[in-house]
Amino acid sequence: MKQSTMQWETLLSTKRFGMEAYHKKDTEDRSEFQRDYDRLIFSSPFRRLQNKTQVFPLPGSVFVHNRLTHSLEVACVGRSLGTNIAHQLSILHQKSSNFLPEIGSIVSAACLAHDLGNPPFGHSGEKAIASFFSEGNGSFIKERLENETEWNDLIFFEGNANSLRLLTHQFKGRRYGGFAMTYSTLASIVKY
């Protein structure tokens, strides 16, 4: 059986969500993936991570800092890993796309965004939100929602899905497509 190779030109796209009609192939001083990273750094949702605690239970002590610091650290490690993987892929697939060097930028942008939609206390916070609506004082809201899908978003709250919502939702007075991230960056954020 013949082994198929990945089509990097198809997998890595500079097209932006919500701006498909405005796609241009020629870039200026930054790549489209570096623009994704920059859009995240300067965004309000990213800056709000400074108010969320990140707790690492380590043997003998508990290390506490905020999720903004955590996300910046994760982005640095992710960029290094992505760059190393891209280097190895370029050796294996010498005729592949010129996008391979951009994998580090894509991974670092995904790492920056990985906690955007998560509540304080991570998975415990997700469970608290879900139980507040399904079993607690928030159950009355079900009657006010337009459909079952909205209710399920609350009782099965999931931080990764909320991150994607934050990045793609059109906020009041803003452009269609939310952050208008590249499809490659959005795809890498879906499930880290």
PLM region descriptions:
Residues 57-63:
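Short hinge/gating elements
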Residues 30, 65-68:
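Low-complexity, highly charged intrinsically disordered N-terminal segments
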Residues 1-29, 41-52, 61, 72, ...:
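Sequence-structural signature of the catalytic-core scaffold of metal-dependent phosphohydrolases
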Residues 68, 112-113:
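Alpha-helical architecture
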